[in-house]
């Protein structure tokens, strides 16, 4: 699992994010037990530990990347200040070194984007006052020239090019990475990127997706097991360095795309060639050869 991947990468890792704090149906923090355990385990090690905050809602009306929740948390100044205080207080109570802000799905709402920007300035100041580091995770679709604060580290997701929302393909490819890195130059330093392990499976993806079955994210280990089980030979795609294969079983055709360490190293090299030295890996667990990742 994640612990094994961390052990394999230990000498190349200088920070770890404990993912994730979300919200319950009353807009109160929901902290899973495994996050508490992870914080306790990693904060004793010689690396920076971040507590990650998302705008996911856990419970009966479960919702990921909930925009309505962000409006309630950031919509007026009193709510925003309360949100800042609560994030900083929780991070301080856990004894972590920093806050990782992973709010998503706000950029298309111009008014919410402006509220979010004000919020990041206030959160940045509060983190400085409380001796906490701040990392802000951003989707590649965010307008990076919108006026972000100097001070935090900005981590841009270099994935989700293909996934459950689309037809088959790699989570990232050269064109997507280079386009996003060019846009990122509008962000203040320090700039970093996040790369995704694993891949996705598409069942019965017909012409233009008119006929489509199950789509699910899978780990590298699961992808390798599927290829072995169905005697499929993965091929490496030139544009993305990702591996892909198809197989037929039980009357269904399935296409699988996934990343291995060679894929991730190609992406890391591309980012490094554009001046990005800091790379986050999402996520640890289910990888077969993660020790092969380059750190430079």
Regions found by a protein language model. Give the residues of each.
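Conserved, mostly hydrophobic/aromatic
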Residues: 16, 101, 154, 193, ...
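Substrate-binding surface in catalytic domains of secreted glycosidases
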Residues: 25-34, 108, 113-226
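Glycan-recognition patch characteristic of GH18 chitinases/ENGases
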Residues: 1-81
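Extracellular low-complexity, Gly/Ser/Thr-rich intrinsically disordered linkers
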Residues: 246-295
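Active-site groove signature of glycoside hydrolases
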Residues: 82-114, 154-160
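A cross-domain feature marking catalytic cores of carbohydrate-active enzymes
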Residues: 20, 51-55, 103-105, 136-140, ...
């Amino acid at each position: 699992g994640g612990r094994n991947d961390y052990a394999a990468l230990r000498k190349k890792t200088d920070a770890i994010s404990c993912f994730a704090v979300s919200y319950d149906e009353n807009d109160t923090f929901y902290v899973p037990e495994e996050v508490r355990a992870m914080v306790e385990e990693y904060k004793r090690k010689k690396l920076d530990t971040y507590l990650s905050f998302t705008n996911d809602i856990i419970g009966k009306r479960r919702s990921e990347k909930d925009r309505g929740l962000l409006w309630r948390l950031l919509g007026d100044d009193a709510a925003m200040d309360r949100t800042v205080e609560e994030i900083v207080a929780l991070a301080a109570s856990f004894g972590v070194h920093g806050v990782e802000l992973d709010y998503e799905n706000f950029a298309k709402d111009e008014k919410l984007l402006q509220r979010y920007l004000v919020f990041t300035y206030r959160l940045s100041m509060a983190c400085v006052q409380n001796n906490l580091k701040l990392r802000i995770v951003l989707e590649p679709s965010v307008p990076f020239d919108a006026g972000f604060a100097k001070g935090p580290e900005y981590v841009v997701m270099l994935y989700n090019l293909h996934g459950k929302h689309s037809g088959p393909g790699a989570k990232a490819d050269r064109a997507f990475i280079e386009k996003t890195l060019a846009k990122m130059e509008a962000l203040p330093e320090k700039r970093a990127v996040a790369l995704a392990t694993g891949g996705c499976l598409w069942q019965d993806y017909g012409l233009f997706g008119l006929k489509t079955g199950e789509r699910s994210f899978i780990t590298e280990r699961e992808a390798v097991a599927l290829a072995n089980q169905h005697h499929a030979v993965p091929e490496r795609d030139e544009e993305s360095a990702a591996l892909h294969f198809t197989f037929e079983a039980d009357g269904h055709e399935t296409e699988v795309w996934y990343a291995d360490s060679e894929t991730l190293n190609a992406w890391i090299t591309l980012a490094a060639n554009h001046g990005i030295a800091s790379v986050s890996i999402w996520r640890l667990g289910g990888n077969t050869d993660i020790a092969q990742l380059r750190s430079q």
